[in-house]
Amino acid sequence: MNFGETIERVKTRSYIARRANWDDDMFIFAQIPANINEETIPKMQSLPEVVKREITEAGFTSLSYQNQICKFDNGVITYFTPTGNEIFADDWETKSDDTLAK
């Protein structure tokens, strides 16, 4: 499957991977969009205290996580930016609800 086809699958909450080149525990997924309310912001572990203060002092009462493409690699989640080789590769696989597609 090519990269364009797999990105369309990511939009449907599937994950994508290149099993020929990557470890079995590495894959790409889209974070589910979320709205974070005012009560949750101070409790967020993913934001530094100074950032939480800036957000609340600026008067924001909610945060919105949108369109974040993430890479899971051996228990660590980071952002994903594809390389040229990954964009042009035809060996992508997708998985959704335990169904593998190549």
Where are the regions that the model predicts?
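Short, compact, well-ordered microdomains
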Residues: S62-K102
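Extended non-catalytic interaction/regulatory regions in multidomain proteins
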Residues: M1-F72
